[in-house]
UniProtKB/Swiss-Prot annotation:
Residues given in the record as substrate binding sites: R56, G272, D273, T305
Protein name as annotated: Pyruvate kinase
Single GO term (MF): magnesium ion binding
Family recorded in the similarity comment: Belongs to the pyruvate kinase family.
Residues binding ATP: N58, F59, S60, H61, R98, K184
NCBIfam families linked to this entry: PRK05826.1 (NF004491), PRK06354.1 (NF004978), pyruv_kin (TIGR01064)
Catalyzed chemical reaction(s): pyruvate + ATP = phosphoenolpyruvate + ADP + H(+)
Top EC class for this record: transferase
E.C. code: 2.7.1.40
Residues holding Mg(2+): E249, D273
Gene from which the chain derives: pyk1
Native organism: Schizosaccharomyces pombe (strain 972 / ATCC 24843) (Fission yeast)
Amino acid sequence: MSSSAVSPKQWVAGLNSELDIPAVNRRTSIICTIGPKSNNVETLCKLRDAGMNIVRMNFSHGSYEYHQSVIDNARKASATNPLFPLAIALDTKGPEIRTGLTVGGTDYPISSGHEMIFTTDDAYAEKCNDKVMYIDYKNITKVIQPGRIIYVDDGILSFTVIEKVDDKNLKVRVNNNGKISSKKGVNLPKTDVDLPALSEKDKADLRFGVKNGVDMIFASFIRRAEDVIHIREVLGEEGKNIKIICKIENQQGVNNFDSILDVTDGIMVARGDLGIEIPASQVFVAQKMMIAKCNIAGKPVACATQMLESMTYNPRPTRAEVSDVGNAVLDGADLVMLSGETTKGSYPVEAVTYMAETARVAEASIPYGSLYQEMFGLVRRPLECATETTAVAAIGASIESDAKAIVVLSTSGNTARLCSKYRPSIPIVMVTRCPQRARQSHLNRGVYPVIYEKEPLSDWQKDVDARVAYGCQQAYKMNILKKGDKIIVLQGAVGGKGHTSIFRLTVAE
């Protein structure tokens, strides 16, 4: 029985834990954060071979010299196997609130019930102790109300605001035992803050990214649509093709999600800070909501933070972690991410291997027929975009014809993205002359980029046929196609950039 003929619950009830996973390529992309332990060509090649698609640089740490070495090593690793181009992502530090320095670098123990002062007075920036703690957000006394909670050090310390003493000082009560230390992060849940989208450091980091031709920006602590517009302005003309992926990690970002989604290229569900800003028990609800809205909009969405965290030190993940990865894929995530597992972990390659295999199992458990019908039913008609109309029709034809792949000839990557939106059960092979667009296509589930380097032929149709043939040749090497398989080809009607308006059924030769 086809998946479109049964309800979602019936489909799940029919799954088998001894599922025979077909020998298909994984469709969900994997982001790996690179740290000193993994920043070498040999390890990067191993990570790629295990399943890494995107190299992430965390600009909360490291010098420009270090990040330059990551870029250089990633490109060297990518060049060893052009069949699998690696994308490079720059993750901004973003606007943060931090405590000051303690006197002499000493840690000061504090107990539940203890009362102290939080101050924005610069005189205490390097004189924090168990009586006064400096906060570097000048407007904290203006935005926070008595009774609100302030978290410090990733939520390890919790304080309740008792009263506003004056324009620079808050009186707070300690909610749990702990210690006051230097330069710890501060979170203000349920409080709207007016921090700028980009610090001066972030702006310099973005310029570094533009100079080095990074493929995408993971923009931290995005709170409103205007933040995205500001980032685009800083990237400027030279960086206009860099994709912006907004990290949602606070209540403001969740509240303004729809307007952010309208202007961004994609979303990352950043569950670390989000789980401090909103109750941890509500994070999975926010995750499902954001993934669903991204799927409906046809924009890529990544799920991140603590996915296989135990593998930082252990050779095998916990069962809960594996379920977390699998369920993120079932929710509809286009990408899943590793952080400490690959920056400092003892088992980085094993972590990627587990993540890749779990994603493949989850993908094999999806009722593609009913999913396509559901996505098609959610589209507002008539479709305003000719390319999307063609993509929808092509996927429908692929189902009826039992085609084995969709070959997309693309300049911008937009057609492949729109095909991915409808979650076809077969791979999308994107053939493009633009290496950056090829690398960026890793943002979309089920898209396999092929870089075609030959110059255009004067005869448009001959050039089309040459690109299709090359795409099929590369698909053979990726074990996506066999000669004689039916394929759907999507192309434009004329040369150059424009709408994709033609699809045809043919045979891979």
